[in-house]
Regions:
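N-proximal low-complexity "stem/linker" segments adjacent to membrane-targeting elements
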Residues: 1-37
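Cell-envelope/extracellular polymer assembly enzymes that use nucleotide-activated donors
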Residues: 13-16, 44, 173
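Acidic donor-binding segment of Leloir-type glycosyltransferases
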Residues: 32-76
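Glycine-rich, basic loop-to-helix element that forms the pyrophosphate-binding segment
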Residues: 75-92
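Short aromatic/hydrophobic "clamp" motif used to bind/position activated sugar donors
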Residues: 97
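Conserved donor NDP-sugar-binding/catalytic core segment of glycosyltransferases
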Residues: 109-140
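Catalytic beta-strand/loop signature of glycosyltransferases that borders the donor
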Residues: 129, 185-192, 197
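Acidic donor-binding loop at a coil-to-helix junction in glycosyltransferase catalytic cores
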Residues: 168-177
């Protein structure tokens, strides 16, 4: 699953941000903006999409950043999300890989803070212990309960287990494996990541309403307004 890592001249490790996307060019553009705003260098963004996804291909044609690489995968046979994530890891050049979901917002300090947290803990990987939720339908913002939030994973590429060949829950298995090996650090900086709840989420709205929202805390109105502005621009 590994290719040769590429640190920069100063020896700072390259971080590969891995984005699997399909048919969401507006959200993808925000994910690209978040990548461009990162304070960590060197970094690269890998965007994995399927060959029948014309909307993503058209969006990619407008971006010419040297540190953004597009990986087009044949649409047939159909691959699971786990399989597509494995392709992204295999294509990554970084010493670290970071899950970079296209529908969420990533603070400019996210990569720097998580790599630093992993290194300080002597761990191979780091996830956030809490993050923020933005419910786009209701226009409400929350802070999550404390747990290992899989979507925020930043990990050494050589420590990454394969994602299971499933369409949902693939990142949970990877994080559980890293934790079981004692390789996982947790960072409690919820403002580094805003998870967007919307109609196209992998798990659907019922998962938010039944499993996540009951354990989350609604944010005060002034903070909620800042979250709204951050996510919607």
């Amino acid at each position: 699953m590994q290719s040769e890592s590429a640190p920069d001249d100063a020896g700072t490790p390259l971080v590969s941000c891995l984005c699997v996307t399909r048919g969401r060019p507006r959200l993808l553009a925000r994910a690209v903006h978040c990548f461009r705003a990162q304070t960590w260098t060197p970094r690269e963004l890998l965007i994995v999409y399927e060959s029948d996804d014309a909307a993503t291909r058209e969006a990619l044609a407008a971006w010419h950043d040297e540190d953004i690489r597009a990986i087009e995968v044949p649409a047939v046979p159909k691959r699971t999300l786990g399989a597509l994530r494995n392709i992204a890891v295999a294509e990554a050049r970084g010493h670290y890989v970071a899950q970079w979901d296209d529908d969420d917002w990533h603070a400019p300090q996210r990569l720097a803070a998580q790599v630093d947290a992993a290194q300080r803990a002597g761990a191979a990987a780091c996830v956030l212990a809490r993050w923020l939720f933005w419910d786009a339908q209701a226009g409400e913002a929350y802070v999550s309960a404390r747990r290992a939030w899989e979507g925020s994973l930043v990990a050494r590429r050589d420590a990454m287990p394969d994602y299971p060949d499933v369409t949902r829950g693939e990142d949970s298995e990877v994080v559980r494996s890293l934790a079981a090996q004692g390789l996982l650090a947790m960072l409690d900086e919820p403002t580094l990541y805003i998870y967007t709840v919307h109609a196209g989420n992998t798990w659907g709205r019922a998962h938010w309403e039944d499993k996540l929202r009951p354990h989350a805390q609604r944010l005060p109105a002034d903070i909620e307004a800042r979250v709204r502005l951050t996510v919607t621009g």
